[in-house]
């Protein structure tokens, strides 16, 4: 009798678990616990950790600092739009047409950088340039996304700057509406909403932007879908040879704007169409040695902050903790010795630069204080 009742309850509970889809949660937790138990608690010494990571992926050690002298000469344009291009013949015409067909009285220029393309990208750019006086084209050997953007930064002669990726496109009144908001509010940055689309243009997601003044914390970390006062962009380069080079926006550009108490404004309008690339960096990084670049670029940009007179703060410290969690999401599939080396390096980084901020309020902080790798994994997986 007891056996029959037990079987009945087992069936009932199993049905509830299946109905609520808790079986997936239990399965995930089972594999997570199994993974935790398989980890060794031993950690490498700091020098050994550095050597392990250096053998896995050399640190580019590329600074973002750009020495830019102030000029009293009036800017030639209201806006420079910087478009890095590499093998994008399939999407380039849509991008350029969207930039040219702007309904605005503001004066703007399109700076296109052909970054060593091997398809017809260069020819398309030359044809558009010959037919449109406000398109400037640079042809260069392949230097990567950062190198292409930096070539555009060298040519800036405008009050504001906009970055557009060459497989994306903008709405017809993007330039006019954003510059109007920038001038009326004396804003250092104006950010709009965006739509994420598939490779063939189908809408995946719409992200609205509220109208009005924003805090720095409300900005997305991407250089796109916003316009920025050129003085801030002319003071930086995108670091070369890293993944996640956009980190310079949050760690340097936004920090400079916050330091100057400059205004940040949002327009309640879809401005930008961002094309999702299933073969892009964020999708392929998990299997690449460059996935550890979050560690490298965070360390380099932290050093660069001193060159800009940027100091530590509670907000910056919390951003670093967020970055550490993000790094684990990018490296979790790498070998254990790599993840342990990254943990040791981040631990040294925190203790060297944020000892006064470290507390035991969160699992993540506690893991670094106690040098507890298992706790670190748990925090990165479950702690918000």
Regions found by a protein language model. Give the residues of each.
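Conserved donor NDP-sugar-binding/catalytic core segment of glycosyltransferases
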Residues: 173-204
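Short aromatic/hydrophobic "clamp" motif used to bind/position activated sugar donors
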Residues: 161
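Membrane-interface aromatic/basic loop that binds lipid-linked glycans or pyrophosphate carriers
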Residues: 2-64, 117, 333-384
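Short, well-formed alpha-helical segments that are part of the catalytic scaffolds
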Residues: 88-101
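Cell-envelope/extracellular polymer assembly enzymes that use nucleotide-activated donors
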Residues: 77-80, 98, 109, 248
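A conserved acidic beta->alpha catalytic loop
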Residues: 98, 114-123, 141, 165
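Conserved nucleotide-sugar donor-binding catalytic segment
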Residues: 212-294
């Amino acid at each position: 009798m007891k056996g029959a009742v037990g079987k009945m309850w087992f069936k009932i509970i199993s049905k509830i678990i299946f109905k609520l889809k808790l079986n997936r949660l239990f399965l995930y937790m089972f594999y997570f616990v199994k993974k935790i138990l398989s980890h060794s608690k031993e950690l490498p010494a700091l020098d050994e950790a550095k050597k392990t990571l250096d053998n896995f992926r050399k640190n580019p050690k590329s600074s973002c600092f750009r020495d830019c002298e102030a000029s009293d000469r009036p800017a030639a344009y209201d806006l420079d739009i910087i478009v890095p291009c590499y093998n994008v013949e399939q999407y380039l015409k849509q991008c350029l047409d969207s930039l040219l067909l702007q309904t605005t009285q503001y004066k703007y220029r399109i700076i296109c950088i052909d970054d060593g393309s091997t398809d017809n990208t260069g020819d398309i750019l030359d044809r558009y340039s010959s037919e449109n006086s406000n398109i400037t084209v640079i042809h260069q050997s392949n230097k990567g996304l950062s190198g292409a953007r930096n070539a555009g930064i060298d040519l800036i002669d405008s009050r504001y700057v906009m970055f557009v990726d060459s497989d994306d496109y903008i709405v017809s009144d993007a330039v006019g509406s954003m510059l109007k908001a920038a001038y009326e509010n004396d804003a250092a940055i104006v950010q709009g909403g965006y739509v994420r689309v598939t490779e063939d243009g189908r809408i995946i997601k719409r992200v609205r932007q509220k109208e009005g003044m924003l805090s720095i914390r409300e900005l997305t970390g991407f250089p796109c879908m916003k316009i920025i006062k050129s003085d801030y962009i002319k003071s930086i380069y995108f670091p070369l040879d890293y993944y996640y080079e956009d980190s310079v926006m949050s760690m340097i550009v936004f920090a400079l704007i916050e330091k100057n108490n400059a205004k940040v404004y949002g327009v309640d309008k879809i401005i930008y169409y961002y094309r999702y690339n299933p073969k892009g960096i964020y999708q392929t990084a998990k299997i690449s040695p460059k996935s550890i670049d979050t560690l490298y670029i965070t360390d380099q940009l932290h050093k660069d902050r001193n060159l800009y007179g940027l100091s530590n703060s509670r907000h910056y410290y919390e951003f670093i903790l967020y970055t550490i969690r993000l790094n684990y999401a990018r490296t979790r599939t790498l070998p254990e010795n790599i993840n342990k080396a990254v943990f040791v390096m981040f631990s040294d980084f925190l203790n060297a630069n944020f000892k006064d901020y470290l507390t035991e309020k969160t699992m993540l902080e506690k893991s670094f204080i106690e040098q507890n790798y298992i706790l670190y994994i748990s925090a990165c997986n479950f702690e918000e």
